[in-house]
């Protein structure tokens, strides 16, 4: 079986560009052995210091188990060797993560940028299994300290300043070397271990960052240390991962249980953590979903998170709009919340990712909206004021009260009413006098004697007179020489019947016209 030593040095992101994209440089990427994708190849793990490589065969067996089953947790993990073995994993397989508090004892997960062309600086772990990364950028100098406890622990990291530390399990050793307290490392000599096969130093933004005594120099943004952190798997990023596809590394499901470190090995191409950064005055967004806090010997390993392959998310204004996927967040035994800090990072994250509080203050993220395929330019969005918005007309709703007809009593159907109902209605309405006076009727009404065969019995003929044989009011026929009254329209009635009628109304019962005019006198 072929063996291969893979050396991937730590990676640095240049955050001082003004174009909005992070420039990542790579000066050297040394690899020995066969570089082809060989699933049967094994990685050699070398101990640091005077420690012997005890139990490497067991590690290889677990390594192969993780290769064959990349997403299944390893239940029987190798025990602590009890010696200062200080296994050094290839540095490209992990990157130091940010520690949110100075009380963290161990950070179990690792990171890798997974981006092409990386700016790299060399470094290794010393005999005390400690590591330090310090760097300078265009805006200032920051120092990065990494320390790991003695034994099979790989380094736990700090980022903000020297106050971010990790206590060693051996109280006899000092947690930090006095040389760590310096913020400037002038005239440092180049120290490149032979096993790293390095050729030269890797430059940062303003000169060269030269490692010395197993400490790494790393250029980073000075303002990035004050913001929350998170990471997504680089397998869901559009950029490629530099190592070959058969790279197997310790993933984010690592933890500590009863003082013994526990690892799970997963294919680096399938579930390699990555780091996202933003340039300019914005902040670095780094970290991990599996970052444990405030847990002295209470951290327990958990299962690997399950990543949905079809739930895409878009990070706006981030490395050419990189498309990432939102992982499913599982619960941990640690009572501290894990997740993402929405402090100005413009990541529109889904509601499945909780919030990681780095301090006692509670932060609230922006409301979750439906994600768009392309980033929206918020400057071009026009928000109308309330007075310009569409107003609904609710006037029809208030017309319901007018459904009741206030004049319904005046719209009675008298044609279907009985006589008793008409009398009752007459009593309610009262007497309405539109007729003529009796004296006026006697004066104006034309009278005559009925003679059968003659159309008119009066002295003055009338063209409008009409001959009828019966009175329409009393419905009786006229008798010979009976007195008949004639109206102006020519209709004839009994004298007594028409007088009573005219006293009620001055209308002809047949044609409904004016019965007697006020300007004429009877002759």
UniProtKB/Swiss-Prot annotation:
Region Disordered: start-end pairs: 18-43
Its annotated pathway reads: Protein modification; protein ubiquitination
Any GO MF annotation of the entry: ubiquitin protein ligase activity
Reaction(s) this enzyme catalyzes, per UniProt? S-ubiquitinyl-[E2 ubiquitin-conjugating enzyme]-L-cysteine + [acceptor protein]-L-lysine = [E2 ubiquitin-conjugating enzyme]-L-cysteine + N(6)-ubiquitinyl-[acceptor protein]-L-lysine
TM ranges: none
Quote the EC number: 2.3.2.27
- Enumerate composition-biased segments (Polar residues): 29-40
Q: Which Gene3D superfamilies match?
A: Zinc/RING finger domain, C3HC4 (zinc finger)
Which InterPro entries does this one have? MBR1/2-like (IPR045191), Znf_RING (IPR001841), Znf_RING/FYVE/PHD (IPR013083)
Q: Where is the composition biased (Basic and acidic residues)?
A: 18-28
The induction text for this entry reads:
Not induced by salt stress.
Q: Name one GO biological process term.
A: protein ubiquitination
**What is the top-level taxon of the source organism?**
Eukaryota
Question: Which keywords accompany this UniProt record?
Answer: Metal-binding, Transferase, Ubl conjugation pathway, Zinc, Zinc-finger
State the domain notes. The RING-type zinc finger domain mediates binding to an E2 ubiquitin-conjugating enzyme.
Its annotated function is as follows: Probable E3 ubiquitin-protein ligase.
- Family named by the database record: Belongs to the RING-type zinc finger family.
Which PANTHER family does the record associate with it?
E3 UBIQUITIN-PROTEIN LIGASE RNF165, E3 UBIQUITIN-PROTEIN LIGASE ZFP1-RELATED
Q: How does it assemble?
A: Interacts with DJA6.
**What is this protein's name?**
Probable E3 ubiquitin-protein ligase ZFP1
Annotated source species: Oryza sativa subsp. japonica (Rice)
Source taxonomy: Eukaryota, Viridiplantae, Streptophyta, Embryophyta, Tracheophyta
